[in-house]
A protein has these predicted regions:
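Residue-level signal for inorganic ion chemistry
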Residues: 6, 16, 178, 211, ...
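Short glycine/serine-rich loop segments
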Residues: 67-183, 387-397, 402-405
């Protein structure tokens, strides 16, 4: 389906929080962007009521670069509030619907971006990953999702969740779009001190020859039978491509979820302190209150439940007397996980697992999940994110008619291996397009 009547499309799939009423004319390509990337001609709300009405005066660097390359921004995509979620069900402005089954989630938190990539032809979408927010929805929606190395793409203009974790990346139905668009959005940016001087992408020069499968990731509870069948079939496809496959020990992976949520919530609680009803978005609180009372009242009214939960968790882990016990120890665990991956990359080109342990859940199933159930669902996507390493999800099969993803993680700055892998995979595996209708 091509972009035409965006309202009719969005009424059905709810992928956009806001979209253009203009028609593209001379644009070289059409793209969308997750709604936590600022854009000067659209509201930027990051899925939160507290930012409703906020119109930034500038474009985020990745959006600016795509526009400079001739791109037309079609809209801002729905997401979990500030990126806090696995299913894009924590949005104040619409929950995106999976194009394979409207009663199921698109994944999160870049669910709207994955939905747009799956529904529209010749469309690329910018996503943002903190703990799996690009590859999870890519898996659930049957598209390609690439999260680059931390520092590869500028974060200037990104509404932060976790400063040391956030990465801007790409989602598209076409594997070739990764090769086309990653060089455009990459590069050192004077506006972002976390962006790095980086080696050039050696696209086409480095190929996937060997992969490691961590035993600890595969032995854990929660991977469904259907996903395992697709994964086993994918390993045979890799072998047919001439790739060596070997199971390895990566004992630190079991600590990735607790370490990640300590780091992520700690950073989120500081980042969200600026939203107090005085500078951004809503500014209609009760000004007769004292500051602390105003601050508490306003944030209680406009933050969603998951945002409040993560603010409280992060505030606790940073308190005097607790920071060494939790936050600083989590940073040490992150270094141990990085070392575990580096050890594997001495012998292998990538580490491979399923992207998600199950197919996209139905919304009635999500409503019955506890917060802990939701957090635990990220156990395959968190490890590459906490390390800042580039990772890629490719569609690898279907279970109960829903897409299943295969996750490749490579060493820092080795996106060229992943992009080549995506293009080779695209030739070896027939990716199904969702049957889109209005």
């Amino acid at each position: 389906m091509r972009i035409g009547d965006l309202k009719a499309v969005n009424d059905r799939y709810q992928m956009f929080s806001v979209f253009t009423s203009e028609q593209e004319t001379d644009a070289k390509f059409i793209f969308s962007a997750k709604d936590n990337l600022t854009s000067k001609d659209f509201e930027t709300k990051a899925g939160s009521r507290i930012l409703e009405g906020y119109r930034p005066p500038f474009d985020a660097t990745p959006i600016a670069k795509l526009r400079e390359a001739g791109g037309f921004l079609s809209g801002k995509t729905n997401m979990d509030e500030f990126g806090f979620g696995t299913f894009s069900a924590n949005s104040a402005f619409g929950i995106p619907r999976n194009p394979f089954d409207l009663e199921r989630s698109c994944g999160g938190s870049s669910g709207g971006s994955a939905c747009a990539a799956a529904v529209f032809d010749d469309h690329v979408s910018l996503g943002v990953s903190t703990g799996g927010s690009i590859v999870c929805p890519a898996s659930f929606c049957g598209v390609y999702g690439l999260a680059p190395s931390y520092g590869r793409v500028s974060r200037y203009g990104l509404i932060d969740y976790g400063n040391s974790l956030d990465k801007v990346g790409l989602l598209s139905f076409k594997a070739s779009d990764l090769r086309k668009f990653l060089p455009i959005i990459s590069g050192k940016d004077v506006h972002d001190p976390t962006s790095m001087v980086q080696p050039n992408l050696a696209l086409g020069k480095n190929k996937l020859k060997s992969v490691a499968i961590p035993k600890q990731a595969m032995e854990g509870e929660g991977i469904s039978k259907g996903v395992m069948e697709c994964f086993d079939s994918s390993l045979e496809t890799l072998k047919g491509m001439g790739v060596d496959v070997e199971y390895v020990d990566m004992p630190t992976l079991k600590y990735s979820i607790p370490a990640y949520y300590v780091i992520a919530t700690s950073e989120a609680s500081t980042n969200l302190a600026r939203y107090c009803g005085m500078r951004y978005g809503h500014q209609d609180g009760d000004y007769t209150l004292k500051f602390d009372d105003y601050f508490t009242s306003f944030r209680s009214q406009y933050f969603g439940d998951e945002a409040k939960r993560r603010i409280l968790l992060g505030t606790f882990t940073r308190m005097v007397g607790y920071a060494d016990r939790y936050y600083n120890k989590a940073l040490q665990v992150r270094e141990a996980i990085i070392a575990d991956y580096k050890k594997q990359f001495e012998r292998f080109d990538a580490v491979v697992t399923p992207t998600m342990p199950f197919i996209s859940p139905r919304f009635d199933e999500i409503s019955k999940m506890s917060a802990l159930d939701s957090y635990k669902a990220d156990f395959l996507t968190v490890p590459p994110n906490i390390t800042g390493m580039p990772h890629l999800s490719v569609p690898c099969g279907y279970s109960e008619g829903m897409p299943v993803g295969l996750l490749f993680t490579s060493d820092h700055w080795d996106e060229d291996v992943l992009i080549d892998t995506a293009e080779r995979w695209d030739k070896a595996f027939t990716v199904k397009h969702a049957e889109v209708s209005l």
